[in-house]
Amino acid sequence: MSQPLLRALFAPSSRSYVPAVLLSLALGIQAAHAENSGGNAFVPAGNQQEAHWTINLKDADIREFIDQISEITGETFVVDPRVKGQVSVVSKAQLSLSEVYQLFLSVMSTHGFTVVAQGDQARIVPNAEAKTEAGGGQSAPDRLETRVIQVQQSPVSELIPLIRPLVPQYGHLAAVPSANALIISDRSANIARIEDVIRQLDQKGSHDYSVINLRYGWVMDAAEVLNNAMSRGQAKGAAGAQVIADARTNRLIILGPPQARAKLVQLAQSLDTPTARSANTRVIRLRHNDAKTLAETLGQISEGMKNNGGQGGEQTGGGRPSNILIRADESTNALVLLADPDTVNALEDIVRQLDVPRAQVLVEAAIVEISGDIQDAVGVQWAINKGGMGGTKTNFANTGLSIGTLLQSLESNKAPESIPDGAIVGIGSSSFGALVTALSANTKSNLLSTPSLLTLDNQKAEILVGQNVPFQTGSYTTNSEGSSNPFTTVERKDIGVSLKVTPHINDGAALRLEIEQEISALLPNAQQRNNTDLITSKRSIKSTILAENGQVIVIGGLIQDDVSQAESKVPLLGDIPLLGRLFRSTKDTHTKRNLMVFLRPTVVRDSAGLAALSGKKYSDIRVIDGTRGPEGRPSILPTNANQLFDGQAVDLRELMTE
């Protein structure tokens, strides 16, 4: 199946929605001249200034954005296949060529991609891999590069724990003790900031920084208090100092002149006191995780703490506690910790590292089923009445209607319960009759179902579109005081299209998906009286797969081809050439069914990506609804998705009368 067809499977309609991308070329001298000339500007070639651009993007495809930047700047970009998504830029200012390129680097950085210069070309890759490809070349604040920083005075082993909190997750920091140097892979602007900090630390005698180990307070809270005190001027004498929080070791690093550092050290030590809250108890409100689930995890960790602490016998006041209490308050989604200060600090550090926002995954499925049924049936049946009780007939039921059934209906003056499709011709008299049936049917059907659902990483999700059908499982009758009471037991089952998925996001752009997909339906020819003898068709797939972000993959399929031939005839007479057609009935059936299931996962890591994805889906459904509706009527759906919740109802009667 071709790539355009695979992409078409996930398009809600044949109309494509392309976000408006406005790149307007303007000259500074034109604007002033246009105001005086009523908008008709004429600029002599000799007076033209440097070209400027105003860029406004709304849910634009990131690859289209890269193409536009390449046309403007003349740069050559090699784009990694994993570079996908939509970008939005709102700007009213006119940008020069260098400012346009700087904006481009910032947009790539915001969406998790890095531009790595390689000679006359530039590669656009995810941040996770950019650090292995970072090199030299033209320096820009948002470019990823690798730099070696030579340290003159301080040992690099002492600087590593101080600098590591400043390096983001996608960056890299390593020490070379033999050369007393540091290797940093990060964006140029951050490397410059880190290098400035290293130069402040790398002073003779190491007198320009102080390290404070906090015992009772949380380092992030203490750093916030110190920074607020300096910004508001409340910490007199602390001008020129800088506070760095190392959450991994719960330490404060203070940079600056000795007098300023002494002032901040004194303030930090006054904050690090065993209060009633911090000594034994701590209430932590979670922002992203579930309190009940996290309490179970901490409970297992605390059991390990008690087991390790209890191996040496009874614990003292300086050892680990014999009792650790962890409770979850589901109403406020908070954790309550009760233990000694060291244990509370250790558990709180674990909570801070676990309480991080999880990425989400949008899973879109396309279920394509193409089926065809060709049926040919022809038959001749005879009946002869000799009078009295005598008679002869040829009775064939494989064409849908037998002559015996027809005769019984005539005797009882009732019409047959069912009459098959096709041509039915009857001839004869009271003593002789012939019934000729013929049918040629060709049935084709195409089914496309596209269920989709959004779920958190490592969270199972399910969607079902169908019916809840009752199935009779049993019946019995009870006798009580001479009366009978019939009972029937019924079990309801879901029939339709269902999709269950559990995504797991791995490092990089790969995902592991646990998928359960099922299609079930009631067969139309099943007996449905009193919910008995119901027959359902079922096609299901259960698998675990690996897929890239945004990749369209096929997870399973079925190609079925059934051919059946049925023939009923009178022995010997039905085998006579030509004449034998009057004494036999034939039915040929050819059924073909093709079923394929495609899947496309999309990772959503932040609110901006979720908003862009939701906006695109809403725009797609508006395209299906029609911007003006049939015959020019206004669309029922508003232009903005937020207007769906403003409480203003749409009067369909007005739309029908327009």
From Swiss-Prot:
N3 as annotated region, ranges: 280-365
Start and end residues of each stretch annotated as N2: 206-279
Main subcellular location: membrane
Molecular function per GO: identical protein binding
Region (N1): 142-205
Residue ranges, annotated region (Secretin): 368-606
Region (S domain): 608-658
Disulphide bond pairs: none
Biased composition (Gly residues): 307-320
Entry-linked Gene3D superfamilies: 3.30.1370.120
Region described as Disordered: spans on this chain: 302-322
Signal peptide location: 1-34
Keyword Zinc: no
A GO BP entry: protein secretion
Family the entry assigns: Belongs to the bacterial secretin family. GSP D subfamily.
Function according to Swiss-Prot or TrEMBL: Involved in a type II secretion system (T2SS, formerly general secretion pathway, GSP) for the export of proteins. This subunit forms the outer membrane channel. Among its substrates are PrpL, elastase LasB, chitin binding protein D (CbpD), aminopeptidase PaAP, and metalloprotease ImpA.
Protein name, per record: Secretin XcpQ
Native organism taxonomy: Bacteria, Pseudomonadati, Pseudomonadota, Gammaproteobacteria, Pseudomonadales
Gene: xcpQ
